[in-house]
Amino acid sequence: MRPIHIAQLDKARPVLILTREVVRPHLTNVTVAPITTTVRGLATEVPVDAVNGLNQPSVVSCDNTQTIPVCDLGRQIGYLLASQEPALAEAIGNAFDLDWVVA
């Protein structure tokens, strides 16, 4: 499960950490996707809510991924569930206009 933390971006906001867990301890920066309550219904959004540790229904915005210093990460507040990983993969593929064939 991918962790959700509070991070200092334009303001303190929840983010989903996208960087692989196995390499995180060795890095000074991580790639994150911000989480927002502004839902646009885009194919690049992944719905998240209380089951993920959030106070209100929100979306992971894969159009706005960014790499930030690890020191900008605050406390962990939740996780993306394993069952939500396929939606995340699809949203990232849409955000970067990737074409792939799933075997």
From Swiss-Prot:
InterPro entries with a match to the protein in the record: PemK-like, Plasmid_toxin/cell-grow_inhib
EC nos: 3.1.-.-
Gene ablation phenotype (knockout): Individual deletion of mazF3, mazF6 and mazF9 have little to no phenotype, but a triple mutant shows increased sensitivity to oxidative and antibiotic stress and starvation, decreased formation of persisters cells, and a decreased bacterial load and pathogenic damage in infected guinea pigs.
SUPFAM superfamilies linked to this entry: Cell growth inhibitor/plasmid maintenance toxic component
Gene Ontology MF terms in the entry: DNA binding; RNA endonuclease activity
Subunit details: Forms a complex with cognate antitoxin MazE3, possibly with 1:1 stoichiometry.
Record's protein name: Endoribonuclease MazF3
UniProt organism field: Mycobacterium tuberculosis (strain ATCC 25618 / H37Rv)
Taxonomic placement: Bacteria, Bacillati, Actinomycetota, Actinomycetes, Mycobacteriales
